[in-house]
Amino acid sequence: MRGLLGRSKLGADEGLLLKPGGSVHTFFMRFPIDVVFVDRDGQVTRVVRDLAPWRVAGSRRARAVLELPAGSCARVEIAPGTRLSFID
């Protein structure tokens, strides 16, 4: 899976949902991202803000990972305990 590799940026309202997933890396990425780890019930278990290129992050309880532009979690107030829902 390539994820965001090769992209130069994300739009302010764009993101990538990786499902299933419990960890991410930013090897070869060109920009920092916010990473939201979500459990099977849609509850946020961990938030990593401004994850720089060449880093790794994970959450054992996560079943999905949402990658967002850096600053998005602060802007829309996503924090551990927030419940998210996704529409397929």
Which ranges hold each PLM region?
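Compact, glycine-rich, soluble single-domain proteins
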Residues: 1-88
